[in-house]
């Protein structure tokens, strides 16, 4: 017993010495590989107006870890999930990341919103901590860190896919746009969408904007879009602002007008729970549909509903897939949790998740197909044809499920 205690103390001293010398690679890799648990850390808004996103990500990650642990873990190691509240603020996200590093985090699940994700990815660059980003979608939010990969679609893909979806499903030849000009997520989707519309021959007939400071009264923008006579309004915004827009727009547009958005609209029904018909005719691009007949999806939805009393959204599904992808990567890397080792195997993986079949490019972006959900009377269901995969896949040799 004394020999064991002495050995443990010596190991702790050696690990501390490596940290003191600034050898981040060893801290994130070899030392972590001898632990009995794989510590997954996540950052996101658990309080405030965007808490629905953060809580969904937290719950999806925790459910996956629980299932993996019950099945024997990863190479005999158990997974542990620790989520820290960022309140959606990039500076708070960096502080939360620091707390997770102090806790002994081996793998980071990144941030939830794009702004905080960029801050976390930057902070993690020197630590050799692998980042399996769940839902931060801004194109550049994982740039500059070759150990950062993501589960979710990136914004320019979503904008491009949305424009193609309009054309492929013959929804409209003329559209209106309503977006937040001072938000990277919203502005990024807008830019990609309009560029692709120009290529496909879809005309942007009316464009209206708002900022964070003007996100309470959209009457002027609503009236302009109504008067334009468009049959589709592209709204690449978050559910919080979308609920305000849709509430103020209710009854003003023709009944056959669609409001088309991307993953930021997830959770819209919860935001308009006082009258779910406010979300009627909302179309949302997504890789996940809770009503899918896929057995994997059905099992996930059932387990999530039993655990949390709610139907999982795309944010929960992305996080769930992220944890299973970490499992696949650790196994492919021979049990290592080193950021360098995990990043090295990512482009060789194929993961069959609840958000689809996923592969990854060297730039960290995923390849998988997108669908659209149409909301009617508080129920979302698959609509139209699926969009093509996000980018051309690289060659993949390993499969993990």
Can you say where each PLM-predicted feature lies in the sequence?
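Beta-alpha junction/loop-to-helix N-cap segments that form part of ligand/metal-binding clefts
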Residues: 25-30, 52-59, 71-142, 210-216, ...
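Extracytoplasmic "Venus flytrap"
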Residues: 34, 38-62, 84-91, 112-113, ...
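Extracellular glycoside hydrolase catalytic/binding regions
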Residues: 96, 127-164, 168, 289
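An alpha-beta-alpha
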Residues: 148-209, 232
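Extracellular/periplasmic periplasmic-binding protein-like sensory domains
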Residues: 249-320, 380-381
């Amino acid at each position: 017993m004394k020999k064991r205690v002495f050995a443990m103390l010596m190991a702790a001293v050696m690990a501390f010495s490596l940290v003191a010398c600034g050898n981040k690679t060893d801290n994130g890799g070899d030392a972590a590989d001898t632990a009995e648990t794989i510590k997954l850390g996540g950052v996101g808004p658990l309080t405030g107006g965007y808490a629905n996103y953060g809580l969904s990500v937290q719950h999806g990650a925790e459910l996956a870890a629980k299932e993996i642990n019950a099945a024997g873990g990863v190479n005999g190691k158990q997974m542990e999930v620790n989520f820290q509240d960022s309140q959606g603020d990039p500076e708070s996200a960096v502080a939360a990341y620091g707390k997770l590093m102090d806790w002994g985090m081996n793998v980071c699940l990144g941030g939830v919103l794009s702004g905080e994700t960029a801050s976390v990815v930057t902070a993690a660059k020197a630590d050799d901590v692998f980042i399996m980003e769940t839902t931060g979608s801004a194109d550049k939010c994982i740039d500059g860190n070759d150990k950062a990969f993501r589960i979710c679609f990136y914004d320019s893909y979503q904008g491009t896919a949305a424009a193609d979806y309009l054309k492929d499903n013959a929804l409209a030849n003329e559209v209106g746009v309503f977006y937040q000009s001072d938000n990277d997520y919203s502005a990024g989707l807008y830019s990609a969408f309009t560029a692709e519309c120009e290529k496909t021959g879809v005309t942007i007939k009316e464009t209206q904007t708002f900022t964070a400071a003007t996100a309470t009264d959209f009457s002027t923008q609503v009236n302009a879009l109504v008067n334009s006579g468009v049959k589709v309004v592209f709204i690449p915004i978050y559910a919080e602002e979308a609920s305000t827009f849709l509430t103020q727009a209710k009854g003003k547009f023709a009944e056959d007008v669609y409001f088309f958005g991307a993953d930021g609209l997830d959770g819209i029904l919860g935001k308009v729970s006082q009258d779910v018909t406010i979300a009627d005719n909302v179309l949302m691009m997504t890789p996940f549909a809770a009503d899918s007949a896929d057995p994997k999806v059905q099992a996930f939805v059932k387990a999530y509903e039993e655990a949390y009393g709610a139907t999982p959204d795309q944010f929960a599904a992305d996080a769930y897939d992220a944890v299973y992808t970490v499992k696949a990567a650790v196994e492919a890397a021979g049990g290592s949790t080193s950021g360098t080792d995990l990043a090295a195997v990512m482009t060789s993986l194929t993961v069959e998740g609840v958000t689809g079949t996923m592969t990854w490019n060297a730039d960290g972006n995923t390849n998988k197909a997108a669908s659209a959900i149409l909301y009617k009377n508080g129920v979302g269901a698959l609509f139209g044809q699926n969009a093509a995969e996000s980018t051309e896949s690289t060659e993949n040799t390993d499969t993990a499920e």
